[in-house]
Amino acid sequence: MFLAQEIIRKKRDGHALSDEEIRFFINGIRDNTISEGQIAALAMTIFFHDMTMPERVSLTMAMRDSGTVLDWKSLHLNGPIVDKHSTGGVGDVTSLMLGPMVAACGGYIPMISGRGLGHTGGTLDKLESIPGFDIFPDDNRFREIIKDVGVAIIGQTSSLAPADKRFYATRDITATVDSIPLITASILAKKLAEGLDALVMDVKVGSGAFMPTYELSEALAEAIVGVANGAGVRTTALLTDMNQVLASSAGNAVEVREAVQFLTGEYRNPRLFDVTMALCVEMLISGKLAKDDAEARAKLQAVLDNGKAAEVFGRMVAAQKGPTDFVENYAKYLPTAMLTKAVYADTEGFVSEMDTRALGMAVVAMGGGRRQASDTIDYSVGFTDMARLGDQVDGQRPLAVILAKDENSWQEAAKAVKAAIKLADNAPESTPTVYRRISE
């Protein structure tokens, strides 16, 4: 039997906590036997004293074990259970292509996703722009879809890592969100509860990233790879660029449209293609579905070329109560905005810099995201035809096409776009899409 205040005191004085002490505290968070004040105190001591790698692994596993951990053995699946997690960005629609692509190559992806947070779009919000799409199938249906289709994208239920919800809510109001051991545990507790064989982390870098500097993004990626492997799940991470909107669009319905066009081959933004492929390659190799980069890329290109990936996406949408002909007739089903009009720069020049975060916030301001949890989303609004870094813009080539609910909203968004995109006389040097791969 432990006392919460003694655990806090031990960490306050700079000592490492044992696995038993950490489990006692986390179970107390779940069972409401630990007070909010005690959670806040421990969070602050961890913020200042950090945690050793064994402590980080214990914290993550205790949070994972605070609720249901999915077990797939009874389904006798003939491939690995794999997933991807992104720290979030703008136009980051990779999940919608990656899940079907990897499933078409023999993987099983039980993807538990989130809603939009701050300036970043949420995969669930995007999928809910599809009429009827059910993000909360019951457990048996979820398992059926994974077995039959290979991929399902659903929302987090209260039974998964419940301690994290209470821990995070306290961190949010006590200035202890940006602690790497706490971020790592929060991300991984939910992902590892999926019962995965392998995981790839997409950690964003740049003006639209969750972490403010390259060094902090790198530290988070290294922490996640170390902890997840320590918890027994093969994990690699990619540091990918978020100094500009990743896709050509940003919003909800507009990104779903781009995902379908990507899968069918109608249109593939080259940067989005690079990042999606790189993440899929990691999943295939870690899941032992390919022996190396070349084999993985060949398999992935094949399922894009032969239509299998698009077919899997269509089957997932139908299985989750969306239209059965969505891939063929997406334009018929996705909501359209009242006003669609391009915004042009005031001068000619090359796009040299983009405040990606500000562009994400502009989508939120138009109604495409939530300022508070109770807000409803306008799925139709957003940006398409986004200019990329290095593009030459003038009276012919717009900065973006804005889809808005009315003229006022369009004007506000146009102002935000112009303020967020800087022009120069010369094109900037091109930046990589993937900066670094991190493995154990």
Swiss-Prot record:
Pathway entry: Pyrimidine metabolism; dTMP biosynthesis via salvage pathway; dTMP from thymine: step 1/2
Checking Pfam families in the record gives: Glycos_trans_3N (PF02885), Glycos_transf_3 (PF00591), PYNP_C (PF07831)
- Tell whether Transferase is among the UniProt keywords: yes
Q: Which family does it belong to?
A: Belongs to the thymidine/pyrimidine-nucleoside phosphorylase family.
* Function per UniProt: The enzymes which catalyze the reversible phosphorolysis of pyrimidine nucleosides are involved in the degradation of these compounds and in their utilization as carbon and energy sources, or in the rescue of pyrimidine bases for nucleotide synthesis.
User: What are the GO cellular component annotations?
Assistant: cytosol
Q: What class of enzyme is it?
A: transferase
Q: Which GO terms describe its molecular function?
A: 1,4-alpha-oligoglucan phosphorylase activity; thymidine phosphorylase activity
EC number in record: 2.4.2.4
Gene Ontology biological-process entries: pyrimidine nucleobase metabolic process; thymidine metabolic process
Q: Which reaction does it catalyse?
A: thymidine + phosphate = 2-deoxy-alpha-D-ribose 1-phosphate + thymine
Q: How does it assemble?
A: Homodimer.
What is the protein name stated in its UniProt record? Thymidine phosphorylase
Provide the alphabetized UniProt keywords: Glycosyltransferase, Transferase
Give the highest taxon in the source lineage.
Bacteria
Q: Does the keyword RNA-binding apply?
A: no
